[in-house]
C-alpha cells in the first residue's frame, strides 16, 4: 500500500509540472499582448549572461553554434563602435583628437642600451679604427669571392651566379673539396676584400658565411625563403652592369651597426644612378630581408619599383673575430635561443 501511495504522489507531481508548463506559454502570450496594447516594447534578454561560458556546453554542435553567434555579436558591437566614433570625429572636424597609434611588436620594442647614437664620439672613434675603416676611407675597393659548400647542386650554383650579377666585381669559385682555411690565404694574396660562402642542405641553400678580409670579422647567417629570378612573378629584365645603390634599414644597435657596415663594404662607393638599380638589406625583428629592385619612373612625381631578384632572408647566428676559424675562433656574439629569446619584444640588431 505504501508503494502505491508513493506512486500516486509522484504521479501528482508530474501532473503539476505538466500543468505549469502548459500555463507558461499562455502567460507569455498574455504579457506580450499587454505590452503591445500599451505600446511598450519588452526588454531584450541578454544573449550571453555574464556568468555564461561556452566551453561548458558539452554538445559539440551546440557549442560551435553558440561560439559562432558570440563571434557575430562581437563583430556587430565592434562595427557599431567604429561607426559611432567616426560620426563623433566628423562632428568635431578639426578639433577631433589624433588617431591612436596601433600597438605593434616593433614600436613596443624593449629598449637596448647598445643603441647607436650617430653623434656619439665613441661611435665615431670605433668607426675610424675598425676593420672596415679602410673601405669607408676609400683606401680600398671591394673585390668579392663567392663560393659554396662541397658538391653544390643546381639551385645553389644558380644563386651564386645571380649574386655575382648583383654585387659588382664579384667572382664565383667552386671549391672542389678545398678547405676554407686554405681558401682564405689565397684570397688575401689575390687582394680579395670579402669571402661569401653559401651552404646547402638537401639541395636547398640554408646558410651564408660572410668573412671580411684580411682581419675579419666573420658572420654566420641562417638563410631561408630563397627565390631565384625565374621563381619571382612579374620580375623585370636581367640587371645591367651598373653599380647599384645600397639601402640599409633598421640596424640600430652596436651589433646591428657592425653587420650593416659588413653589408655596405660589399658594394663600391659611387653608385651609378643611371642604372636605377638598388639593393636593400631591411632588418625587421632580427630578420634581414634582401631585395634587388629597379626604379621605374612613371612621371616627375610618381615612381614605382620592379623586382629583379634574387631574394632571400637572413638570420644572424654568430659574429666571430678574425677570419673563419671554427675551432679556435673568438666569438663576439652567439645567438642562444633559450637565454636570449625570452621576450618577443626584444631584438639584437
Swiss-Prot record:
Pfam families: Brix. Keywords: Nucleus, Ribosome biogenesis, RNA-binding, rRNA processing, rRNA-binding. Residues 87-97 have a biased composition (Basic and acidic residues). It is found in: Nucleus, Nucleolus. It comes from the Eukaryota. The keyword Repeat does not apply. Residues 142-325 form the Brix domain. May be required for ribosome biogenesis. This is Ribosome production factor 1. It comes from Mus musculus.
Amino acid at each position: 500500500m505504501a508503494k502505491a501511495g508513493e506512486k500516486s504522489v509522484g504521479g501528482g507531481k508530474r501532473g503539476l509540472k505538466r500543468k505549469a508548463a502548459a500555463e507558461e506559454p499562455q502567460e507569455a502570450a498574455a504579457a506580450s499582448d499587454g505590452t503591445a496594447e500599451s505600446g511598450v516594447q519588452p526588454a531584450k534578454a541578454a544573449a550571453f549572461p555574464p556568468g555564461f561560458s561556452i566551453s561548458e556546453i558539452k554538445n559539440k554542435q551546440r557549442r560551435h553554434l553558440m561560439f559562432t553567434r558570440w563571434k557575430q555579436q562581437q563583430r556587430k558591437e565592434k562595427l557599431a563602435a567604429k561607426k559611432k566614433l567616426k560620426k563623433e570625429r566628423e562632428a568635431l572636424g578639426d578639433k577631433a583628437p589624433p588617431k591612436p597609434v596601433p600597438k605593434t611588436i616593433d614600436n613596443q620594442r624593449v629598449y637596448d642600451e647598445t643603441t647607436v647614437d650617430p653623434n656619439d664620439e665613441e661611435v665615431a672613434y670605433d668607426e675610424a679604427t675598425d676593420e672596415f675603416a679602410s673601405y669607408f676611407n676609400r683606401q680600398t675597393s671591394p673585390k668579392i669571392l663567392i663560393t659554396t659548400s662541397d658538391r653544390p647542386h643546381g639551385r645553389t650554383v644558380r644563386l651564386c651566379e645571380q649574386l655575382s650579377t648583383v654585387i659588382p666585381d664579384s667572382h664565383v669559385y667552386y671549391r672542389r673539396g678545398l678547405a676554407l682555411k686554405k681558401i682564405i690565404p689565397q684570397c688575401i694574396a689575390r687582394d680579395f676584400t670579402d669571402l661569401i660562402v653559401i651552404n646547402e642542405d638537401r639541395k636547398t641553400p640554408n646558410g651564408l658565411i660572410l668573412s671580411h678580409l684580411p682581419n675579419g670579422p666573420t658572420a654566420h647567417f641562417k638563410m631561408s625563403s630563397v627565390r631565384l629570378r625565374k621563381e619571382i612573378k612579374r620580375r623585370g629584365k636581367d640587371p645591367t652592369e651598373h653599380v647599384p645603390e645600397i639601402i640599409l634599414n633598421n640596424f640600430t644597435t652596436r651589433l646591428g651597426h657592425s653587420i650593416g657596415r659588413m653589408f655596405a663594404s660589399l658594394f663600391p662607393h659611387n653608385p651609378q644612378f643611371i642604372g636605377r638599380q638598388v639593393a636593400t638589406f631591411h632588418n625587421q625583428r632580427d630578420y634581414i630581408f634582401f631585395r634587388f629592385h629597379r626604379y621605374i619612373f612613371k612621371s616627375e612625381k610618381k615612381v614605382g619599383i620592379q623586382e629583379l631578384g634574387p631574394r632571400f632572408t637572413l638570420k644572424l647566428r654568430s659574429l666571430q673575430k678574425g677570419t673563419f676559424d671554427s675551432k679556435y675562433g673568438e666569438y663576439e656574439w652567439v645567438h642562444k635561443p633559450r637565454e636570449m629569446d625570452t621576450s618577443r619584444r626584444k631584438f639584437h640588431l
